[in-house]
């Protein structure tokens, strides 16, 4: 049975470095990769990917844009990993990054978390150094911390 690995990304191009780390240290026949993007609840319009209404686009343009960027980043990451031969799934979850990452890692029974060490995108909070430190302090599994940028 494959080991489960959680990859916490953001919507910036720098997230590609985390996928590179995963491909370097994980093996398709040994690991199942779960891509996670934690999004601030301020920028959440829908719980699930869905088209935006004209009213939502007018009333919450920034939130619609951020959510769309996040959904695209997760889908792109999953595609890259699947193309490399990995069983991979992705999710964007609204909430505080530490809570989301720790919660998903526990729920999935992850044996490893891969994340960045500093803020890498305009989503702004996912990979802040304090976030990484808090995650490390709260989980009982190894955390592979990638270099940002």
Question: What are the language-model segments listed below?
Answer:
Residues 1-59:
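Small/aliphatic-rich secondary-structure junction motif
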Residues 34-36, 89-93, 144:
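General small-molecule cofactor/ligand-binding pocket signal
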Residues 50-54, 107-109, 131-132:
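Short, hinge-like loop/turn segments at secondary-structure boundaries
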Residues 55-72:
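A short acidic, glycine-rich active-site loop
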Residues 140-149:
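Short, flexible loop segments at boundaries between secondary-structure elements
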């Amino acid at each position: 049975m494959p080991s489960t690995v959680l990859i916490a990304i953001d919507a910036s191009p720098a997230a590609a470095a985390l996928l590179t780390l995963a491909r370097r240290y994980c093996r398709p026949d040994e690991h199942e990769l779960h891509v996670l993007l934690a999004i601030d609840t301020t920028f959440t319009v829908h719980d699930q990917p869905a088209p935006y209404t004209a009213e939502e686009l007018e009333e919450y343009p920034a939130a619609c844009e951020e959510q769309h960027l996040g959904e695209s980043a997760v889908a792109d990451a999953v595609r890259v990993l699947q193309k490399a031969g990995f069983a991979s799934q992705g999710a964007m979850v609204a909430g505080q990054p530490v809570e989301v990452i720790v919660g998903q890692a526990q729920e999935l029974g992850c044996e490893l978390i891969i994340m960045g060490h500093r803020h890498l995108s305009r989503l702004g909070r996912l990979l802040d150094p304090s976030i990484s430190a808090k995650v490390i302090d709260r989980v009982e599994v190894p955390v592979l911390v990638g270099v940002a940028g």
